[in-house]
Amino acid sequence: MHTVIIIGGGAAGMFAAYSAAINGNRVYLLEKNEKLGKKLYITGKGRCNLTNNVGVQEFLNNVVCNPKFLYGALNELSPDDVMGFFENNGCKLKTERGNRVFPESDKASDVTKTLQRVLSEKGVKIMLNTAVTEIKTESCRVKGVETESGFLPCDSVIVCTGGASYPLTGSTGDGYIFAKKTGHTVTEIKPSLVGIELNGDGFSDLQGLSLKNVSVSFSAADGKEIYRDFGEMLFTHYGVSGPIILSASCTLNRTDLKNVKLKIDLKPALTEKILDERLLREFERAKLKSLSNAMRSLLPQALIETVLIKSGVNGEKRCCDITKSDRLKIAYVLKNLEFSVKKLRPIDEAVVTAGGVSVKDINPKTMESKLIKGLFFAGEVLDVDALTGGFNIQIAFSTGYVAGKNA
């Protein structure tokens, strides 16, 4: 009977432990925190968006970095398989907008409790408050791990330590150190699925404002479009956040952000011509009202002053005094509300980490290192990341499962 040690009790680690156990191994799951699945508890705003209910090819379209590497793992353990696993083990699920899958209870704890119960049933020995300090190798083969309490021998080690995002959950980049010490390449670590800071103070009055059904685009200094999306976003004290902004960060983290502009189309369903006609009708109806007052039928109160300042039209003007030139300026800003990008928020605020152990060093069919026999990597520690919507947790489940199966 092989002995398998898994470092890290998150999504990847728990599925690796499950997979290794059902394949007849003696399995030890080592977690440096006081409980398993600490990051799972806070995903999906505490509801745990655990996968996305789409086919493998559509899933891969949402993977930003190294999607081809994941093809085999996702076919081994697909979103359907993950949903079946939880349903069959008593955790009822539901699918919401954007094919996002959540526990029916809306409690992330139900996901972790289900996994822990299954691991216990399969005989996995869970060792909490156990930090690994080194992976021991000899002649390019794993021999065991060194912990603060001593040496643990084993036949295989699976590194599921997560990335460098949300360090309070225990993701402090340990896996990158293990990888480098065993000769692996680690690509540059960057924040992904993170808020974006804006220059200046032209957004300060918008803090807390949520916008739905808007279109955003990011453009380089030469005007070339870098990213475009449609959906929901939020203004914050530092700039912008929300689903479409987080997704944009997955692309922007690979871009020089100097002179990058964010444009928000507040009325994406209307052309500028149709929007001008709408403005004309609104202003004719409210002839004696001030422009600021009349704009309330078009925009949230917090946005009106910002739009008028950027369009250069006096909000105190009566609607009957608004010229066609004024209307066109307002229509343009409504379609092109522009801000200057400063930088991404720091990695400790990121939902996931971009970069990690180079997939060139890993066998995609097994998740085993090509350099060290018996050493496997799974989950966020790898140089793979995806958009928001349950994709990253599914990647952790799938790569963990494959690693455990082959350990």
Regions found by a protein language model. Give the residues of each.
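An anion/pyrophosphate-binding glycine-rich loop and adjacent beta-alpha core
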Residues: 34-36, 41-42, 50, 56-57, ...
